[in-house]
C-alpha cells in the first residue's frame, strides 16, 4: 500500500463534499430505482430491506415502550422520496417527520406520501441536510437514519448523533441502518461523495457521541455484490 492509499483509508471522511453529494443526487431520478442505485422494484432489495427493518423493530418492541403522555413520533432522516416512511415506518409510528435536502426528492414525496398525508400520518418535511437539522428537544420516539450518514464526516456525524440524542423522548431510540465495509477500514466513494464505514468505526463513533448500542442485526437476503448492511439500535448512555 502506498502512503497516499494509507492516508485515503485513514481519513476517508475528509474527502466528503456536501455540494458534490447534492449535485449527484439531484441528477438521480426520483424513483425507488434511483434512490437505491439501480436496485429498484425489479430486484429483491426493496422488499428484503423492509422485511429486515420491520423484523428488527419488532424484536425491539419491549425496549421501545412509549413513555406516558407521549405519542410514537418518528423522523425519517435522509428520507429520499419517502420510500422507508411509505413502506415501513408508518406502520410503527403515529406520525412521521422527514428530513431530505434534495429538492426533486422532496417534490416526489407529494406523490409517494399522498395517502399518508391524507391520513394525518405525515408531520413536517424539512428540506435540509442532516448537518443543518436540529430536532425539537424531547420530540421523537424513533429517529431512523438509513443509507445517508455516509455523507457526514466523522466529527459531523458525532455532532449529529448528539443532537438526535437531545431530540429523543424518554425511552426514545435512534436506529442507524447503513452499509459496512467488510474490512476494518472505511471506503470513500467519489461518485456520490460518501464514505462507507466499517462496523468497528461505527461502534467507536457511537461511544464518542454518548450512545449505547442496545441491539445490532445484519440485513439478510441482499445480493452478494452489495456491501454488508447492519442495523444499530442506540439509546443515550
Regions found by a protein language model. Give the residues of each.
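Class I (Rossmann-like) S-adenosyl-L-methionine-dependent methyltransferase catalytic domain
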Residues: 1-136, 152-163, 173-237
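A conserved beta-strand element that flanks and buttresses the S-adenosyl-L-methionine
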Residues: 144
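Hydrophobic adenine-recognition pocket in adenosine-nucleotide-binding enzymes
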Residues: 148
